[in-house]
Every structure is written in C-alpha cells, then in structure tokens.
Amino acid sequence: MAEYLASIFGTEKDKVNCSFYFKIGACRHGDRCSRLHNKPTFSQTIALLNIYRNPQNSSQSADGLRCAVSDVEMQEHYDEFFEEVFTEMEEKYGEVEEMNVCDNLGDHLVGNVYVKFRREEDAEKAVIDLNNRWFNGQPIHAELSPVTDFREACCRQYEMGECTRGGFCNFMHLKPISRELRRELYGRRRKKHRSRSRSRERRSRSRDRGRGGGGGGGGGRERDRRRSRDRERSGRF
C-alpha cells in the first residue's frame, strides 16, 4: 500500500495531494483547494509571485482606453526585466541554472518568475532575503517552489501554438527572451564562472597599482560607472 501511495503522489490519481501544485507550484483554487498543497522545506527553485507586469496587459490611457505597445517595445521591456532579475539573483545569491517567467493571465500564475538555482542553500538564502525587499515599488513575495522539471509544468499545446485555453490555461505559458539575451546570459556564463577567480586577482592587482599612483585601475572604474548608469536606467530592486 505504501508503495502504491508513493507511486501516485502528486499525480491526478492522488486524492489527497494537489497534482497542479506539485507540478506547477500554483493552483487556481489557492487556499480553497480541497487537496493539500505540500510546500517544500527545501528546493533548488524559488517563485517570485506576480512580479512581472506585462505592458500589453496593463497599459491604459487616462480615459480607460488601451495604449498600443508594439512587439518590439514589448520585447525590449521584457528583456530588460529578465536581465535585471537574472543578474540580481546570480550576483547576490548564487549560480542560476534556469529562470522562467509566466505569461499566463490567471491570478495564480500571472507574472510569476521561477528561478532554479544550482544549490538548494542559495535558493533558501534568496527566499529569506527577498521577502524583505521590494521590486518596482512593490514588496516581493518569494517562496520555495516544488517545480524542478519545467517540462512537466509547461503547456505543450502552447509551445506548439495550439493551446485553446489562452492566457487562463492552468499550465505554464513561458515567455521567451530574445536569442541575443539568451546567448549573453546562458552561453557566456560558464566561461565567466571559470574565469571569476582570475578576474578577482586581476582586479586586486589593478587596485594595488592604482593606489601606488599607476593607471591600472581605470578600466575597473569605467566598468563601475557603466554599471551605475545601468542601475539608474532600469534598477527596480
């Protein structure tokens, strides 16, 4: 009996535990669900709930009419958001294996961001810290998520352009980033991690030369100025 219960745990045959929450980390019934939502005590994945605001869904003029947002503007806005959050997660908490943003419209999925870290310890640290932070003028609600395999959580029909449920589908409709940004964030990341220790040594030597009156620290200061300008332009944390 125990083996059978273990085999059906989190599936549609399980009458006790919610299969949607187990697969997707969210359920449209919320706390009213008749089945249990077993929140994980440890996980590689965290969920930032309702943090992404899609301009195409929210932009309205003062008279209540919708403002047109072009596809190009939409992609630029989304890429900026994705890069900002991804970079913040890696710089403050640890290596990110995967990050996904829901483009659904249902209240339980709209704007959810799922960040899968390489280490569970980094995910735990991120949740504790992020729940004391704000983003874009709103408090962040972060929690550990049971989702580790996004292939199970995604709507396959949506990926093939055939989902008939639209934005209110209960499976994830993941919003893609541009190819250029994907290459930048994921393609170069491994090289960056391999060279990180060497970069620290070079920066240390540059600072030492700068204090000694040489000009070796100029490149580092210029990078800091560029980062500062970038944060002023798009920083919402």
From Swiss-Prot:
| Alphabetized GO MF terms | pre-mRNA 3'-splice site binding; zinc ion binding
Q: List the GO cellular component terms.
A: nuclear speck; spliceosomal complex; U2AF complex
- Segments forming C3H1-type zinc fingers: 12-40, 149-176
Q: Where is the composition biased (Basic residues)?
A: 188-208
Give the record's keywords alphabetically. Answer: Acetylation, Metal-binding, Methylation, mRNA processing, mRNA splicing, Nucleus, Phosphoprotein, Repeat, RNA-binding, Spliceosome, Zinc, Zinc-finger
Q: Which GO terms describe its biological process?
A: mRNA splicing, via spliceosome
Q: Which residues carry this modification: Phosphoserine?
A: S61, S145
Taxonomy, superkingdom = Eukaryota
Locate the N-acetylalanine modifications and list their residues.
A2
Q: Which CDD domains match?
A: RRM_U2AF35
Q: Does the keyword RNA-binding apply?
A: yes
Q: Per the database record, which ranges form the RRM domain? A: 65-147
Which residues get modified to Omega-N-methylarginine? Answer: R165
Ranges of compositional bias, category Basic and acidic residues: 220-237
For the region Disordered, what residue ranges are annotated?
A: 185-237
- PROSITE patterns linked: RRM, ZF_C3H1
Physiological role? Plays a critical role in both constitutive and enhancer-dependent splicing by mediating protein-protein interactions and protein-RNA interactions required for accurate 3'-splice site selection. Recruits U2 snRNP to the branch point. Directly mediates interactions between U2AF2 and proteins bound to the enhancers and thus may function as a bridge between U2AF2 and the enhancer complex to recruit it to the adjacent intron.
Q: Of which family is this protein a member?
A: Belongs to the splicing factor SR family.
Q: What is known of its domains?
A: The C-terminal SR-rich domain is required for interactions with SR proteins and the splicing regulators TRA and TRA2, and the N-terminal domain is required for formation of the U2AF1/U2AF2 heterodimer.
> What protein name does the entry list?
Splicing factor U2AF 35 kDa subunit
What is the protein's species of origin?
Bos taurus
